[in-house]
């Protein structure tokens, strides 16, 4: 079984989403000793944001300048990693009400018409169903249902929308929120998220 582990936090060892996503991978590795894990650290090795040149350069039979071809190849590598994975674990912090730009750049490389989705007579159809996706969403404040800031949460909601669009309709999402509200709140949020990670079922 192949697992793709993607981290979008820029906070390194201080990151809650990284801590919990690593715990998830450890949990699944313990259940599946032969697990083949690919790791993509989007802070250490960010993908370039999409450009018009790259979109054109990704078309069949395109002739590209070396720098454009390098960018196209990076996107294809990210897409191939995603397509090959049976399980995808994503560390997704909430920055300024949405995902980190590094994680968004990765998403832009895996949402590819004709590969992970297509348009038909009835609209969009996801082509990447069948994968298990587990995401950790960390939030400094309180954005859960019923909170005053719930409508401003565009990390978990965006992830659910994007994943459903490509056919992954039942992602497992672990939320750690309130981590910026003081040391005790952070510890409670982290402990709860780690408990949820430890309780994940085998794939």
UniProtKB/Swiss-Prot annotation:
<comment type="function">
    <text>Also exhibits azoreductase activity. Catalyzes the reductive cleavage of the azo bond in aromatic azo compounds to the corresponding amines.</text>
</comment>
<feature type="binding site">
    <location>
        <begin position="138"/>
        <end position="141"/>
    </location>
    <ligand>
        <name>FMN</name>
    </ligand>
</feature>
<dbReference type="GO" id="GO:0016655">
    <property type="term" value="F:oxidoreductase activity, acting on NAD(P)H, quinone or similar compound as acceptor"/>
</dbReference>
<comment type="subunit">
    <text>Homodimer.</text>
</comment>
<dbReference type="InterPro" id="IPR029039">
    <property type="entry name" value="Flavoprotein-like_sf"/>
</dbReference>
<feature type="binding site">
    <location>
        <position position="9"/>
    </location>
    <ligand>
        <name>FMN</name>
    </ligand>
</feature>
<keyword id="KW-0285">Flavoprotein</keyword>
<dbReference type="InterPro" id="IPR023048">
    <property type="entry name" value="NADH:quinone_OxRdtase_FMN_depd"/>
</dbReference>
<keyword id="KW-0520">NAD</keyword>
<dbReference type="Pfam" id="PF02525">
    <property type="entry name" value="Flavodoxin_2"/>
</dbReference>
<dbReference type="InterPro" id="IPR050104">
    <property type="entry name" value="FMN-dep_NADH:Q_OxRdtase_AzoR1"/>
</dbReference>
<keyword id="KW-0560">Oxidoreductase</keyword>
<dbReference type="InterPro" id="IPR003680">
    <property type="entry name" value="Flavodoxin_fold"/>
</dbReference>
<comment type="function">
    <text>Quinone reductase that provides resistance to thiol-specific stress caused by electrophilic quinones.</text>
</comment>
<comment type="similarity">
    <text>Belongs to the azoreductase type 1 family.</text>
</comment>
<dbReference type="GO" id="GO:0016652">
    <property type="term" value="F:oxidoreductase activity, acting on NAD(P)H as acceptor"/>
</dbReference>
<protein>
    <recommendedName>
        <fullName>FMN-dependent NADH:quinone oxidoreductase</fullName>
        <ecNumber>1.6.5.-</ecNumber>
        <ecNumber>1.7.1.17</ecNumber>
    </recommendedName>
</protein>
<dbReference type="GO" id="GO:0010181">
    <property type="term" value="F:FMN binding"/>
</dbReference>
<keyword id="KW-0288">FMN</keyword>
<feature type="binding site">
    <location>
        <begin position="15"/>
        <end position="17"/>
    </location>
    <ligand>
        <name>FMN</name>
    </ligand>
</feature>
<dbReference type="GO" id="GO:0009055">
    <property type="term" value="F:electron transfer activity"/>
</dbReference>
């Amino acid at each position: 079984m192949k697992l793709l582990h993607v981290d979008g936090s820029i906070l390194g060892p201080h990151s809650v989403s990284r801590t919990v996503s690593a715990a998830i991978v450890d949990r699944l590795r313990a259940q599946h000793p032969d697990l083949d894990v690919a790791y993509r650290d989007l802070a250490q090795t960010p993908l370039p944001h999409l450009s018009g040149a790259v979109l054109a350069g990704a078309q069949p039979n395109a002739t590209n300048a070396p720098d454009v071809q390098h960018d196209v190849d990076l996107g294809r590598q990210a897409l191939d990693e995603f397509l090959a994975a049976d399980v995808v674990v994503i560390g997704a912090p909430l920055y300024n009400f949405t995902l980190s730009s590094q994680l968004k750049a990765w998403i832009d490389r895996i949402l590819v018409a004709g590969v992970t989705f297509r348009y038909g007579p009835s609209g969009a159809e996801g082509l990447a169903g069948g994968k298990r996706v587990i995401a950790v969403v960390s939030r400094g404040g309180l954005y859960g249902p019923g909170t005053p800031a719930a409508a401003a949460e565009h990390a978990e909601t965006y992830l659910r929308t994007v994943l459903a669009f490509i056919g992954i309709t039942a992602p497992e999402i672990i939320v750690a929120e309130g981590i910026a509200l003081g040391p005790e709140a952070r510890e409670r949020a982290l402990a709860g998220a780690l408990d949820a990670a430890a309780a994940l079922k085998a794939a």
